[in-house]
From Swiss-Prot:
Chief site of localization: secreted
Origin superkingdom: Eukaryota
Species assigned in the record: Gallus gallus
InterPro entries xref list: Glucagon_GIP_secretin_VIP, VIP/GHRH-like
Signal peptide: 1-25
Protein name, UniProt field: VIP peptides
One GO MF term attached to the UniProt entry: peptide hormone receptor binding
Gene symbol of the encoding locus: VIP
Residues modified as Threonine amide: T156
Keyword tags: Amidation, Cleavage on pair of basic residues, Hormone, Secreted, Signal
GO process terms (BP): adenylate cyclase-activating G protein-coupled receptor signaling pathway; epinephrine secretion; mRNA stabilization; positive regulation of epinephrine secretion; prolactin secretion; regulation of protein localization
Family classification: Belongs to the glucagon family.
Keyword flag Electron transport: no
Amino acid sequence: MEHRGASPLLLALALLSALCWRARALPPRGAAFPAVPRLGNRLPFDAASESDRAHGSLKSESDILQNTLPENEKFYFDLSRIIDRNARHADGIFTSVYSHLLAKLAVKRYLHSLIRKRVSSQDSPVKRHSDAVFTDNYSRFRKQMAVKKYLNSVLTGKRSQEELNPAKLRGEAEILEPSFSENYDDVSVDELLSHLPLDL
């Protein structure tokens, strides 16, 4: 009888081990796995990565491991490979978008620096131009003041000490002395101008 009582116990133990074996192959409850890829719905892989190309001729450990796995665990191995590919793809997308963002920021900084340089360089020609205008106006003013001062000294009969140098005056007197002698001391400028013929 003991033999007959052990038979249902053995059968229950066999069924329980089979269920546990199958339950171990299922994902844990509440785990976030992507939808189960079927034969027709496999995710396409456009091109092999550099590491895949480097190991192309040799069988990788993952291929050897996949061949030794039982059929019910191969699905999870494929699923982990798909997740790895998706992670690499997400990393690639992030890297691409991030590099574009950095390039845009670099271009923006460069344009701001150009605009800043242009604004600051526009100030300097204006400043140089205003400095040149001031210098030009100041030199004209100085010339006008010198001419006025000279005319006042000539008209009042006062000359500077440089012009009153006797050696210089004798040399000029010999050059400017007319061949005939006339006295111009008592003649005014108005009288001289009135005797000049002016054609109007």
